[in-house]
């Protein structure tokens, strides 16, 4: 990879009008990549559980693979086994003292296994830095994987978050992402619901402020029969923040009886915010059920009057509503330590915004 190479990332699986500038996102990324710092348990060898996990596609697209090509970059591997009970894997990820860092984790859940993966992206020591991290997940038959990702990078520190996953028969994948940092975020998830009755449930919460950019791409491919996915995205944009959300649900031939739904709620609290949303539902199968919806707007006069009647000004009311939206999500983490970290980070970020 060349130094400061231009990459097209977060591509839509089916192109829309070019003038919308939503088919993909162009970023410049430094090719001089060094291993990121990850505090984790001792790695275990991933089993060959019916597929080569390394070949999975992530939601950020093929061009981003160049970032991870250096053989010296960090690769962690974990396996969850049914006899081990409910397993929790905690990863603290940072660029530390590097300007450009990257790493990968492979996680396989064997048949009937249950595992929770908690990834926290924390600020590096450099004021300007890039962190790219790739997570690949294989959920074996009747297994459950919960992936929880918390972004807390400071302003000037970019995160490229690449997630790829495959779900076997009756497997379940739950993804919860909280973007409560100050830096730009490029987030891509791709999931292959290959097994019959496999499921994906995704919840994303974010706050964008100042000049921050949030660019998200979710691609869910339904292959098996009676598969199910639901996507829920909730966030707030303030000041001159920019956000793009691409949500694609693709019902492949043979996926009869499958269902997919995506919903987004965006609170706009700045005159200069820029919000773009493109829900995409593709069908090659007749007997499927796909839906999408979005609620985008400001606080209405009735809500503001309610707060004003209680002596609460508009700015404070906006902060209360912003925090409430995200509190509902992070309480789904079901890990007391991580919930506390997110609550503290949210308070810190919102306090910074008011300065």
Where do the language-model regions lie?
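Conserved beta-strand/loop scaffold segments within soluble protein domains that form the structured core
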Residues: 5, 58-305, 309-310, 333, ...
């Amino acid at each position: 990879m060349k130094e400061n190479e231009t990459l097209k990332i977060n591509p839509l699986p089916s192109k829309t009008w070019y003038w919308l500038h939503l088919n993909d996102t162009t970023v410049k990324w430094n090719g001089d990549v060094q291993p990121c710092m990850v505090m984790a348990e001792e790695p275990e060898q991933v089993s060959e559980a019916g597929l080569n996990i390394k070949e999975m596609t992530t939601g950020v697209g093929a061009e981003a693979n160049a970032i991870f090509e250096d053989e010296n970059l960090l690769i962690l591997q974990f396996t969850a086994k049914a006899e081990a009970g409910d397993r929790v894997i905690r990863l603290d990820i940072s660029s530390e003292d590097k300007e450009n860092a990257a790493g990968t984790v492979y996680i396989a859940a064997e048949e009937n296994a249950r595992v929770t993966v908690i990834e926290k992206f924390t600020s590096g020591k450099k004021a300007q830095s890039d962190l790219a991290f790739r997570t690949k997940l294989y959920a074996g038959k009747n297994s459950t994987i919960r992936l929880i990702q918390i972004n807390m990078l400071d302003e000037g520190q970019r995160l490229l978050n690449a997630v790829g996953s495959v779900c076997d028969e009756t497997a379940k994948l739950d993804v919860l992402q909280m973007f409560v940092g100050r830096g730009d975020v490029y987030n891509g998830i791709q999931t292959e619901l290959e097994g019959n009755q496999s499921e994906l449930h995704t919840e994303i919460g974010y706050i964008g402020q100042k000049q921050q950019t949030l660019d998200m791409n979710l691609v869910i491919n339904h292959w098996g029969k009676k598969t199910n996915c639901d996507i829920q995205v909730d966030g707030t944009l303030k000041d001159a923040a920019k956000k793009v959300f691409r949500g694609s649900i693709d019902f492949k031939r043979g996926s009869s009886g499958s269902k997919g739904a995506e919903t987004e709620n965006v609170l706009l609290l700045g005159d200069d915010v820029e919000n773009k949303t493109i829900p995409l539902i593709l069908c090659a199968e007749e007997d499927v059920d796909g839906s999408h919806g979005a609620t985008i707007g400001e606080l209405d006069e009735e809500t503001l009057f309610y707060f004003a009647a209680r002596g609460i000004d508009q700015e404070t009311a906006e902060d209360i509503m912003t925090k409430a939206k995200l509190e509902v999500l992070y309480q789904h983490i079901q890990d007391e330590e991580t919930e506390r970290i997110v609550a503290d980070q949210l308070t810190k970020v919102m306090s910074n915004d008011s300065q």
